[in-house]
Amino acid sequence: MFTRNLAGFAVVLALGACASAPADGPNLGRQVAPDEIAAWDTSIMPDGAGLPSGSGTAGQGASIYAQKCVACHGENGKGGTALALDAKGPIISINAAEKTIGNFWPYATTLFDYIRRAMPWQQPKTLTSDEVYALTAYVLVLNRVIGENDAMNATTLPRVRMPNRDGFILRFPDKM
């Protein structure tokens, strides 16, 4: 019994010594600067929290679209190799219509966030905030959600009411 207690005491003593020893390691990495974190923290909420400064109109977006988007999405958002960007009509049921931005997406801020993170497909995250606002405005005009002269920015974009905003059912409303 004494031997067993002695062995247990030795293990506890060894673990205690290891816990107080300085951590010697490969010293990899470095402290991340706040501006580096800010560059990666690009989340945009449906209410517009996180939207950057800048602005754009559909007219500006049309010229950017012609340069950077038409190859995949086609003229006026139709006929390209990628999904169509304009609404073909309201969604009556899950299978009744093709899901597009105008008839399915619940928030315009989600469109901005998606364009900013994922487009253009061959060079994602290369658009400026002004270009993203302009392209967002252009796509919203294609879907007849906003007027051609409406400017999109951090104030106006969250106010855009998407046609299908209320078309989603909360699965767990008590968790909201």
Q: What positions do the PLM features span?
A:
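Electrostatic cytochrome c docking/interface patches
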Residues: N27-I64, P120-Q123
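Bacterial N-terminal signal peptides that target proteins for export
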Residues: M1-F9
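Flexible coil segments in periplasmic/lumen-exposed cytochrome c-class electron-transfer proteins
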Residues: Q122-M176
